[in-house]
């Protein structure tokens, strides 16, 4: 499905992961990823090697969590997380991604890298222990969630290395120029639920028009659902991103956009409300929060990764930004 001739491309990275693939095959992967991120800021990724069982398990966990009674979910709401770590349950109507509209209808469960409460950095922004629901055992929920997170960290590390090769081709920088974002990174993950509405208010979305804050996002969409759209400026239109079998949706965030001088584009996107229930899982590589980046094309000054992401998140939370103070 596309608007006109525009469709978000699909890239098969199996050759990049293969020890026997030719250099030409690997270079083809780099070129396809580079082109997609430069033109659209989005692409569908297949040939990733993530088992179907792991994807099915994480959707099972997502459904189990959101089936819990609201009072159970509220026991681990984000206001109960340590300091500014922002972990746990985020109820519906907490965030407003698009100014001037009603709050987003999505609800989510947020985890990050597991940082013990006695760690010196625990309680700092996006850093601390995770919160877990009492009504779900470790075996049926915590364990598969953390296993999936580990798979996503491996996958996003692969994507960053492919992106680095693309930067090398474009600007001549070393191919490992982006690797610093993988050192002790902030890697929040959100299990997401969008409740169905037959007649939604036109001023409200599941998630309003926005760009992601960090470097690279990995989205797993549920089969048979719709709602995600990407803005394509050359044609001033929204391009739907339908669910593709075995695919992850990859997109660039604002930190990557700034770092590459806009070469890898952070694209606006949104999720509109439908009459069908929708689940998805979003993994975000924000990067090392202490890292200061300068545009690789020399176009601007230095910026702090952590300060940028904290500021953007606080803006979407509005009065609820008290959870970050």
Swiss-Prot record:
Gene3D superfamilies: B-lactam Antibiotic, Isopenicillin N Synthase, Chain
Name of the protein: 2-oxoglutarate-dependent dioxygenase tropC
Physiological role: 2-oxoglutarate-dependent dioxygenase; part of the gene cluster that mediates the biosynthesis of the tropolone class of fungal maleic anhydrides. The pathway begins with the synthesis of 3-methylorcinaldehyde by the non-reducing polyketide synthase (PKS) tropA. 3-methylorcinaldehyde is the substrate for the FAD-dependent monooxygenase tropB to yield a dearomatized hydroxycyclohexadione. The 2-oxoglutarate-dependent dioxygenase tropC then performs the oxidative ring expansion to provide the first tropolone metabolite stipitaldehyde.
GO biological process: small molecule biosynthetic process
Binding residues for 2-oxoglutarate: 278
Co-factor binding comment: Binds 1 Fe(2+) ion per subunit.
Cofactor(s) needed: Fe(2+)
Keyword line: Dioxygenase, Iron, Metal-binding, Oxidoreductase
Mutant lacking the gene: phenotype: Impairs the production of tropolones but leads to the accumulation of talaroenamine.
UniProt source species: Talaromyces stipitatus (strain ATCC 10500 / CBS 375.48 / QM 6759 / NRRL 1006)
EC number of the protein: 1.14.-.-
Sequence positions that bind Fe cation: 210, 212, 269
Phylogenetic placement of the source organism: Eukaryota, Fungi, Dikarya, Ascomycota, Pezizomycotina
Record-linked PANTHER family: 2-OXOGLUTARATE (2OG) AND FE(II)-DEPENDENT OXYGENASE SUPERFAMILY PROTEIN-RELATED (PTHR47990)
Family named by the database record: Belongs to the iron/ascorbate-dependent oxidoreductase family.
GO molecular function annotation: dioxygenase activity; metal ion binding
Domain of life: Eukaryota
Enzyme class: oxidoreductase
Pathway named in the protein's UniProt entry: Secondary metabolite biosynthesis
Residue span, Fe2OG dioxygenase domain: 185-287
């Amino acid at each position: 499905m596309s608007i006109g001739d525009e469709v978000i491309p699909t890239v098969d990275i199996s050759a990049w992961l293969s020890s026997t693939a030719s250099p030409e095959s690997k270079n083809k992967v780099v070129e396809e990823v580079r082109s997609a991120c430069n033109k659209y800021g989005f692409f569908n990724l297949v040939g990733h090697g993530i088992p179907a069982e792991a994807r099915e398990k994480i959707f099972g966990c997502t459904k189990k969590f959101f089936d819990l009674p609201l009072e159970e979910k509220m026991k681990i709401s984000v206001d109960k997380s340590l300091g500014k770590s922002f972990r746990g349950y985020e109820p519906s109507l907490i965030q407003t991604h698009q100014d001037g509209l009603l709050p987003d209808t999505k609800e989510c469960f947020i985890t990050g890298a597991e940082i013990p409460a006695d760690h010196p950095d625990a309680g700092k922004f996006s850093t601390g222990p995770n919160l877990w629901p009492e009504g779900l055992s470790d075996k049926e929920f915590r364990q598969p969630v953390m296993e999936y997170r580990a798979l996503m960290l491996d996958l996003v590390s692969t994507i960053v290395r492919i992106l680095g090769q693309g930067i090398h081709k474009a600007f001549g920088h070393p191919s490992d120029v982006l690797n610093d974002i993988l050192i002790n990174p902030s890697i929040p993950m959100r299990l997401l639920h969008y409740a169905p509405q037959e007649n939604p208010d036109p001023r409200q979305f599941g998630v309003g028009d926005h760009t992601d804050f960090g470097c690279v996002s990995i989205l797993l969409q549920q089969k048979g659902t719709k709602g995600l759209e990407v803005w394509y400026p050359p044609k001033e239109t929204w391009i739907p991103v339908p669910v593709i079998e075995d695919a992850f949706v990859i997109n660039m965030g604002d930190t990557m956009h700034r770092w590459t001088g806009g070469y890898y584009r952070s694209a606006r996107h949104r999720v509109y409300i439908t009459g069908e229930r929708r689940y998805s899982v979003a993994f975000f590589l924000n990067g090392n929060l202490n890292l200061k980046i300068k545009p690789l094309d020399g176009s601007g000054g230095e910026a702090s990764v952590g300060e940028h992401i904290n500021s953007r998140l606080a803006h979407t939370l509005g009065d609820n930004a008290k959870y970050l103070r």
